[in-house]
Amino acid sequence: MKKILALLVIAPLLVSCSGNKNQADNEAFIKDTNGFEILMGQFAHNIENIWGLKEVLIAGPKDYVKYTDQYQTRSHINFDAGTITVETIATTDPAAHLRQAIITTLLMGDDPGSIDLYSDANDIQISKEPFLYGQVLDNNGEPIRWEWRAAHFADYLLQNKMQKRTSGLHVIWSVTLQLVPNHLDKRAHKYLPLVRQSAEKYGVEESLILAIMQTESSFNPYAVSGSDALGLMQVVQHTAGRDVFKMKGKSGQPSRSYLFDPANNIDAGTAYLSILQNTYLGGIQNATSRRYAVITSYNGGAGSVLRVFSSDKNQAVNIINNMAPGDVFQTLTTKHPSGESRRYLVKVNSAQKSYRRH
């Protein structure tokens, strides 16, 4: 564990010595990425040692996972499936461990910067405005804001929903509950004022911002990824974050705590969309074709998008400008070298259509 804690301190500092030259920036990028990969490897190994080979569960873009009780208890919110699962391998009074984890999960606030997902610290602050308020209803069909109601619901779940399974040498006790059917819309609504503010500030469509957020994180402000993309719009510090800071006349790159703040994250993600839209891909004349290119670039970079059409960037823009938007879409979704980027354009485009109807 000392290794993990040391890496938590070291990883954010790995880029601090980089200069302004491209070579220095690239070296910083490699160090930062390698540092984070080492941290994740250590963390996964630690979980495997405690829970077993088939029980490794780590936070992701659409999965909130928080360990407590010396890593013996964990809370998992699957924002795609709309489920909350609280589990423990504690051998003494597992119900008590589950009860505490259920209560703190139901009442946690929406300040991702205050919670360390890579430690077992019980650092979850109970909030008067819980992040999950309205997304979970108790056994009486009521939303949960107060500790007494969360405690009553936890007791109900333990009496009626507690499950037991065996995995390797461990007996795992768990409780699973469902989010309300429209949980995605409820989370999206929470961030609408910030989305509208950034849309107006940077000249980016609200529907596009919302579609990106849905696809990237399912509106999970705690979102992290294996590539160290952070927050609602999954902004990477040393790529998009650096470009946005340069646009704002700032040196360096945003910190993790900066990007875990929802307002900062939406601002940075939207600013980056505007950079793609107006700078990197500004030569694309048709707005729909440009939007397809921007969406794909948000996932895989503008350079890789243009190279689908030509190795020469100017020639690529000319080729796109002589194509119908539907052909641009077809080309990007079939010929982009990254399968993830090909699927990403389809997902975001579909999500954006649904937000345009609202």
UniProtKB/Swiss-Prot annotation:
The first-level EC class reads: lyase
GO BP field: cell wall macromolecule catabolic process; cell wall organization; peptidoglycan metabolic process
Report the coiled-coil segments. none
Q: Where are the transmembrane segments?
A: none
Residues with covalent lipid (S-diacylglycerol cysteine) sit at: C17
- This protein's UniProt keywords: Cell outer membrane, Cell wall biogenesis/degradation, Lipoprotein, Lyase, Membrane, Palmitate, Signal
The GO terms this record gives for MF are:
hydrolase activity, acting on glycosyl bonds; peptidoglycan lytic transglycosylase activity
One Pfam match, by short name? SLT
Q: Which reaction does it catalyse?
A: Exolytic cleavage of the (1->4)-beta-glycosidic linkage between N-acetylmuramic acid (MurNAc) and N-acetylglucosamine (GlcNAc) residues in peptidoglycan, from either the reducing or the non-reducing ends of the peptidoglycan chains, with concomitant formation of a 1,6-anhydrobond in the MurNAc residue
Give the subcellular location: Cell outer membrane
Question: What InterPro entries does this protein's entry cite?
Answer: Lysozyme-like_dom_sf (IPR023346), Murein_transglycosylaseC (IPR023664), Murein_transglycosylaseC_N (IPR024570), Transglyc_AS (IPR000189), Transglycosylase_SLT_dom_1 (IPR008258)
- Extract the signal peptide range: 1-16
One GO CC term of this entry?
Answer: cell outer membrane
Question: How is this protein positioned relative to the membrane?
Answer: Lipid-anchor
Give its E.C. classification number: 4.2.2.n1
- Attached lipid, kind N-palmitoyl cysteine, located at C17
Q: What does this protein do?
A: Murein-degrading enzyme. May play a role in recycling of muropeptides during cell elongation and/or cell division.
Q: Which family does it belong to?
A: Belongs to the transglycosylase Slt family.
Q: Which HAMAP family match?
A: MltC
What protein is this chain from? Membrane-bound lytic murein transglycosylase C
Q: List the top taxonomic levels of the source.
A: Bacteria, Pseudomonadati, Pseudomonadota, Gammaproteobacteria, Enterobacterales
**Gene that this sequence comes from:** mltC
